[in-house]
Amino acid sequence: MSDPKTIAQLRATIADLMRWFEGEDLRAAVIGGVAAGLHGRPRLTKDVDAVVFSDDAAALVASAGSYGFATRIDDALDFSRRTRVLLLRHHSGVDVDISLGALSFEAEIVDRAQVIDIGGLAIRIATPEDLIIMKALARRPEDIADIGGIIDVQHQLDVDRIRFWVREFSSVLEMPEIFEDLERLLQRRKL
């Protein structure tokens, strides 16, 4: 997504997402590639990811249409009950994945979110620390690259918070390699 048309579509999607969050008083924040690009190395992405602290996917779907969003699969509500992800599409054609937050950590993500102004567009995004935590759990190559980009750009990270949450999730999931991978990355950057 590097041509002006697709950048404009992404911007329009984010603008409507912010209007939706504010208009419906949703506890929400942008996460994923958009947020990682704003906190770290800029990169383009094909979709927008957000976390909304809500259990009511039906109410979200009902209000989404007023802001230019529709479900992108036929059984979106059933899918969201099984996966806690609501799959939407903006009228511009950009896909939006809404994670339905329920964990205390997800509540913290939205409560700690920051507003960043990009060319007059105020975007509510997860903090750099919370993005690193989420991306450490995902463990995909692009997530590891995003972590590196965030660490390289952000020089006032709360590394204790990052270590605490990744250690907690690593323990609960019985996957010590999650914490070990993060620790190697932090040590390489002398954090």
Where in this protein do the model-derived segments appear?
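Compositionally biased terminal segments of proteins
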Residues: M1-L191
